[in-house]
Amino acid sequence: MRNPVKQKKQEALHLHDGDANGYSFHNKTFIELFAGIGLIHEALRPLGWEAALANDNDPKKIRAYKANYPEVPLVDRDIRILDLCEYPAARLVTASFPCIDLSQAGNRQGLNGEHSSLVRTFLEKVSQLSKCSKKPEFLLIENVPNLLSIHNGTALEEILRTLAELEYGFDVVQVDAKHFTPQSRNRVFIIAVDLGRHPLRRRAFPNDHLRRHKLAEAYRKNPLLPWFFFDFPHLPSRELSLRDIIESVPESSPVWWDTEQTDYFWSLVEHDHKLKLEALLKGGRSHVFTAVRRLRRRRKREQIFNVRFDGLASCLRTPGGGSSTQYVVVIKDGLLRGRRLTALEAARLQGVCLPEYSPNFELVGSDTDVKYAFGDAVCVPAVRWVIEHSIEQLIPNLVRRRFAAGVQDELTLA
């Protein structure tokens, strides 16, 4: 004979498994737009999230995505002709939209540029999902820090106002990958929450390490927008060092600079950096640094090597010459040797292919293809940290409320 109390409790727990927005209440599903090689997926998977759909239209990135996530439905078409209402609903939709028109290396056209304007397309897709009863509960938008300042902050304001019109509250934070891997990579995350499911949190602007000057300015300009501030902890102290990232390359490998290339490096290295390197060469200890080749500032357009002595790599970029190329500089046994950063090292700087992080992630394509893909991607542990301390904090509360409803029914029956 069935236990009526147990049955009633189970019915209460599963009452909303298929809610009005089309997704199972207990499932943590997401749609990954601008998916690239899938590093948002890699960040979410250990937290129990399942990809309902991925979308990108770069053939090389798509091959890499399919190699690592063959089970995920992947639509390889322009997002502008993608009808998300044709696909299963998801609790979360993510968008690492193109940064080229926002970044310092781009033409600074902002949201009017050909590429970065696709965030408007993304927001239109969210609006369409609302109209077909598949409104996502959460959104995650990621991009470069210039999103906060370009065109006097009007690009960010446009995104936030559109989210408000779609009845989402939002938090905006800046997180640097250097707290997780030895890479200086500061990024902006917009976490949006459906106000129909989660009451707005009205509180003072938390002027902290995650919400610095430009964000404070955005809040002062728009205090009446539905800001939804999360209680983030302090950013963690990084455990990985640059030595953990660097491959062990045999000294006989041709990837190391020859004498002519080494002399070229010494001829272009910044003066103060050259003095530091010369002093370290005399010290007898081994050291590992990264370096980039840049244009000398405030002078003629001539190249110069800058060496980082802070234990970090510079922000990974897509290959294209100039400062997009990073070098590994090693001092050992009184000698200086150098080479280009490898594809595996680029992957490790983004938090995969490491014993602690995604050791089985597959690198697909040529060395240049891999560097391009990772230069255009996200830092996996940084994204995971943002999700863990924002969206993840809301989902358990919902589950507890459903469970509490079942317990209350049990007490009533008893």
Q: What function would you assign to each model-found segment?
A:
Residues G38, P59, P98-L102, P145-N146, ...:
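Short, solvent-exposed loop/turn segments at secondary-structure junctions
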Residues L82-A90, Q104-R308:
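Class I S-adenosyl-L-methionine
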Residues D17, S252-A414:
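C-terminal target-recognition/interaction regions appended to catalytic cores
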Residues S96, F138, R340-A343:
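Short aromatic/basic micro-patch
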